[in-house]
């Protein structure tokens, strides 16, 4: 019995180690996503570079050190809003099942899917969770999952059929945690959970356990620790081989499958039937794959474990990664980051040149200063409306002259126009898709054709996301359909 407990503990730790490894392997994905998010929402001068001494510094700080103010013309945000807006204007949910329609409406999936598409454009990933909400009378609930709280093994299949381990990090109150792990009706288990989370050694236990599993960086901190006053729980789903018994009850003409560990129950039932001379239950040993869920504390405690309770027999997540060429994830917005940076540099340069150029400088010959006037008088009268300055030409013929220079005529505007045009070409989001008329003379048919052409350029993005929504609805149907 002791060896069995040790084996179970070793297996649980091995699974948690695999989950942590999957989390670490996604560190680059989270880093790139955070950079893409910063650019999309206007924080576009945070990329690191070096100063003249080789010290790391942000591009914005470096620009300020040269006396210029870094400016941002956020074209990426408008691009993303246009793509999401086009999606929302074309949403069509043709659902023939009344129960599914009610769930879709209750969960406000139009809003959820729009935000999921925005995440998909920014990070190349979108994840939703379809599950029963035990905090709301087991109502069927759909939620978007934050990529920063999600982990999965390295997958190559765009359908994610090669998923082997998947999970989510949760920050919960103590009451929520007790209900999530199925201890709400078990006072002893609830007290045990309260004890392991609320004692003076909790922080020390987290450090010791996470260090044993190799945690030694900031990414590790995000996995094991919360950023608020709640309690961290780690939900891990794995696909495992399991011994089963395929059973045929010849008395009731039913066919069912049970875990091999329940063989003694069948044996007892068959013994009773032999005495009554009734048909027995015939069995056949077999191996099958099952999805199993485990909940862990950050101190390594196994809080709960169970086989998938859903009719579809898998985990509750629906995910899509794009495009998964050689397993790589590349988002829609990352293609235009270089153009966005160049546009920002150009408008910063133009602003600096305009600020430093001569604007209305007055050249007034010293010998032409009228008698009784000071230079302050000349300055005041020159800037006043209808001002008059008496002036007597001298022998040199010099007259006052005001100078205004067009110092921006250095090709900067032309370069800016080129970059903005390239931005449209690379992204596929043209002016028509943004609702802008390129010419007043353009006809409605031509304008619609431009929109259709732009939509074709984005067709792969839209179709991939619609496949994700279809997978989500199929998972919903498999839960609510009768067995």
Label the model's feature ranges.
Residues 69-98, 128, 132, 151-154, ...:
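Long amphipathic alpha-helical segments
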Residues 340:
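Conserved short S/T/G-enriched processing/targeting/catalytic segments and their helical context
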Residues 1-291, 295-298, 358, 411, ...:
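Extended, helix-rich architectural segments
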Residues 336:
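His/Asp/Glu-rich acidic catalytic environments and adjacent acidic regulatory segments
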Residues 361-362:
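Juxtamembrane/interface segments at transmembrane-helix termini
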């Amino acid at each position: 019995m002791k060896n069995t407990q040790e084996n179970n503990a070793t297996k649980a730790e091995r699974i948690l180690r695999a989950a942590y490894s999957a989390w670490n392997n996604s560190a680059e994905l989270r880093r790139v996503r955070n950079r893409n998010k910063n650019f999309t929402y206007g924080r576009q001068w945070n990329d690191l570079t070096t100063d003249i001494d080789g010290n790391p510094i942000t591009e914005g700080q470096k620009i300020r050190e040269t006396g210029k103010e870094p400016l941002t013309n956020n074209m990426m945000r408008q691009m993303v809003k246009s793509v999401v807006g086009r999606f929302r204007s074309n949403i069509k949910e043709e659902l023939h099942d009344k129960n599914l329609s009610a769930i879709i409406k209750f969960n406000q999936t139009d809003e959820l899917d729009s935000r999921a598409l925005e995440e998909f454009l920014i990070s190349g990933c979108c994840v939703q969770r379809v599950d029963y909400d035990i905090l709301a009378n087991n109502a069927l609930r759909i939620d978007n999952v934050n990529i920063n709280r999600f982990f999965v093994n390295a997958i190559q299949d765009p359908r994610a059929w090669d998923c082997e381990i998947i999970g989510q990090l949760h920050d919960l109150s103590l009451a929520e945690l007790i209900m999530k792990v199925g201890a709400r009706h078990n006072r002893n288990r609830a007290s045990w959970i309260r004890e392991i989370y609320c004692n003076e050694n909790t922080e020390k236990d987290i450090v010791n356990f996470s260090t044993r599993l190799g945690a030694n960086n900031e990414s590790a901190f995000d996995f094991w620790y919360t950023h608020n006053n709640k309690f961290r729980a780690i939900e891990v789903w794995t696909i495992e081989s399991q011994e089963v018994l395929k059973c045929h009850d010849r008395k009731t003409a039913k066919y069912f499958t049970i875990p091999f560990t329940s063989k003694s129950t069948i044996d007892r039932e068959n013994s009773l039937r032999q005495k009554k001379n009734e048909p027995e239950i015939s069995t056949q040993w077999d191996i099958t794959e099952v999805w199993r869920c485990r909940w862990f504390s950050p101190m390594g405690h196994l809080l709960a474990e169970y086989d998938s309770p859903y009719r579809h027999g898998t985990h509750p997540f629906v995910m899509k990664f794009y495009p998964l060429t050689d397993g790589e994830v590349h988002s829609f917005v990352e293609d235009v980051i270089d153009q966005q940076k160049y546009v920002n540099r150009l408008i910063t340069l133009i602003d600096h040149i305009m600020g430093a150029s001569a604007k209305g400088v007055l050249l007034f010959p010293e010998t032409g200063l009228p008698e009784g006037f000071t230079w302050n008088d000349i300055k005041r009268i020159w800037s006043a409306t209808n001002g008059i300055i008496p002036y007597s030409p001298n022998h040199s013929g010099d007259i006052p002259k005001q100078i205004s220079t067009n110092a921006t005529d250095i090709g900067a505007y032309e370069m800016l126009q080129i970059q903005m045009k390239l931005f449209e070409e690379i992204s596929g989001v043209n002016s028509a898709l943004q609702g802008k008329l390129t010419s007043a003379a353009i006809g409605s048919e031509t304008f619609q054709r431009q929109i259709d052409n732009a939509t074709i350029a984005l067709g792969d993005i839209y179709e991939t996301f619609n496949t994700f929504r279809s997978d989500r609805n199929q998972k919903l149907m498999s839960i609510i359909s009768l067995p």
